[in-house]
């Protein structure tokens, strides 16, 4: 009896899954519009060493990793916090090593 219930549930799930409207393939123009939207979104990032205090999650990506908004207090009596997009050192070293390996092996 349990096997019959499992098979019926499986068939019911497959029928519902195959008849759903949300699984339709994207048409070419929809895909192009999605890509255009993604490129527009990608251009709105904050470059490295620029001020990111207005939006700390909008730093640009390097070739492998995303930069991080790093905040600090500068020396010299300024007590205002300064935030810039920077790449952490360990990620910078990993990116340089990957580039050297890529250049070594073509």
Swiss-Prot record:
Gene Ontology CC terms? extracellular region
Q: Which UniProt keywords apply?
A: Disulfide bond, Knottin, Secreted, Signal, Toxin
Q: Any idea which GO molecular function terms this record carries?
A: toxin activity
- Identify the main location: secreted
The entry's propeptide annotation covers: 21-41
Q: Where are the transmembrane segments?
A: none
Q: This protein's superkingdom?
A: Eukaryota
Tissue expression, as annotated, is:
Expressed by the venom gland.
According to UniProt, the name of this protein is Toxin-like structure LSTX-D9
């Amino acid at each position: 009896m349990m096997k019959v219930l499992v098979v019926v549930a499986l068939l019911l799930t497959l029928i519902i899954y195959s008849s759903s409207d949300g699984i339709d393939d994207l048409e070419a123009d929809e895909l192009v519009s999605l890509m255009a939207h993604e490129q527009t979104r990608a251009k709105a990032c904050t470059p490295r060493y620029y001020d990111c205090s207005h939006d700390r999650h909008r730093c640009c990506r390097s070739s492998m990793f995303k930069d991080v908004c790093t905040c600090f207090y500068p020396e010299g009596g300024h007590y205002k916090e300064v935030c810039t997009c920077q790449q952490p050192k360990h990620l910078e070293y990993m990116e340089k090593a990957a580039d050297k390996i890529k250049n070594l092996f073509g």
